[in-house]
């Protein structure tokens, strides 16, 4: 396994719409394994393939167990996700490995039902609420070329852009 480079905002790669996975083979398995190592190394709870510059509809979610401990047992590998139902709303603070060091409150559906495939091509249907629901929506947004900051209202979005420019200037000085 290898730790992959994470593509960060404002890289245009993140705006690409990811293509459906057609082959459930060893190359996909290696990518998923590398993505998991990358996500864990970077303290993430989710990672979409496009975030490592691979434009396919594959993502990982690991919100951990009841104590927040992440492991392969709590990992959900999601290929070609499709939302079947959604309802309710919730606001939660989100962050993103592609937008490092920025967090803000985003409104999402509270409950979702998602159909997807695992690494072997087996179909699954899962109902999710709370953080898991947020993670499914956040990571699937990546597959559609969107970042969580696009869901911010106008004032918060302008604040983000200003803070992000300042952060980039600070990083360049180092």
Curated annotation (Swiss-Prot):
EC nos: 3.5.1.88
One Gene Ontology MF term: peptide deformylase activity
Residue pairs linked by disulfide bridges in the UniProt entry: none
Catalytic activity: N-terminal N-formyl-L-methionyl-[peptide] + H2O = N-terminal L-methionyl-[peptide] + formate
Amino-acid positions noted as binding Fe cation in the UniProt annotation, renumbered to this chain: 96, 138, 142
Cofactor binding comment, as recorded: Binds 1 Fe(2+) ion.
UniProt-annotated catalytic positions: 139
Source species, domain of life: Bacteria
Similarity remark: Belongs to the polypeptide deformylase family.
Name under which the protein is recorded: Peptide deformylase
Source organism: Nautilia profundicola (strain ATCC BAA-1463 / DSM 18972 / AmH)
Organism classification: Bacteria, Pseudomonadati, Campylobacterota, Epsilonproteobacteria, Nautiliales
Gene name of the record: def
């Amino acid at each position: 396994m290898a730790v992959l480079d994470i593509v960060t905002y404002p890289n245009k790669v993140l705006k690409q719409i990811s293509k459906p996975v057609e082959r459930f083979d060893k190359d996909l398995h290696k990518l998923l394994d590398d993505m998991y190592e990358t996500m864990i190394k970077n303290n993430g709870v989710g990672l979409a393939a496009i975030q490592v510059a691979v434009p396919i509809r594959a993502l990982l979610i690991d919100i951990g167990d009841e104590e927040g401990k992440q492991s392969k047992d709590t990992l959900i590998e999601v290929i070609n996700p499709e939302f079947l139902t959604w309802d309710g709303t919730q606001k939660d603070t989100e962050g993103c490995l592609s937008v490092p060091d920025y967090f803000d409150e985003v409104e999402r559906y509270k409950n979702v039902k998602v159909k997807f495939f695992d690494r072997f091509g087996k179909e699954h249907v899962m109902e999710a609420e709370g953080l898991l629901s947020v993670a499914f929506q956040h990571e699937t947004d990546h597959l559609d070329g969107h970042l969580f900051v696009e869901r911010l209202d106008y004032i918060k979005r302008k604040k983000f852009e200003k803070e992000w420019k300042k952060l980039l200037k600070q990083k360049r000085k180092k």
